Amino acid sequence: MNKPSDNISVQILVSTIRVEGLRRLAKSSLPLAPWLSYLVGCQRGGDSPESIGREFERLFGNRCDVSLKIYDTFGLSVSRNSLKSETTGVVMIFIADDVALDAGALAYVRDYFASHGEVDVVKTRIRINGRFIGGDKPRCVRRNRWRGEYAVANALAMRRNSLDGLAFCPCLGVGAARYLSGEDDIFFTQVLEKGLRVEYLPVEMAVHNGQSTAERFHSPGVLLARGLVLAYVHPHTWPVHAALLAARVEGSGWWRNFRTIARGASELKDIAELRRR
């Protein structure tokens, strides 16, 4: 007899750039399972399509569950949107090329989708600098204008059919011209604004082995983006959140950090553009 989970396929959407990115991915943990597949979006970054194709075949030629798309575009959000438009999985998860996946946690999340047809998105626990964030109990996630709800993409498993009309903002994230983070926060906030059913599960699907946004928080491009996100999520109370955030960031001093965050929060045209998306 077939189980409900037999109808749930999971596709991991991997954004990377150049041949070096494929090599990083090959060193990561990519579990094998009959219901699991991987779609790799490799932005050329100056490398030829032929060299990328040859390296992919060398590294993953024996993996029929891993497929490749080569893009001439640039920017993490742009790559994710392209992958989202091409995924075939019932459930999709976005990851970077240096993320290690946990097979047991992926199976648990898949089974949860199978037995909870009303759930659109599962948010899982994340680890930042060795510290777990998210809590130890399952819960329904709702938007809270004071506290906010934030997420990272590799801790979100999402039903493909629930995400119509949603996309990552190309002006945010690695490779963007000005705002070098914030793409996950805005995307997830818009998931909640759309009224999708989001459940939190205290499992860890993925571990990010590379440099995280938290580790480059002092970068002006990241702080600008944090200000933009704070003004979007907390339009009336963002100065309080900005002051608290500035105190936690090491490197440039509280006042300089606060000024940079406030500049991002004051970009009313960009914030209005996000609200129109």
Regions found by a protein language model. Give the residues of each.
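Acidic donor-binding loop at a coil-to-helix junction in glycosyltransferase catalytic cores
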Residues: 173-187
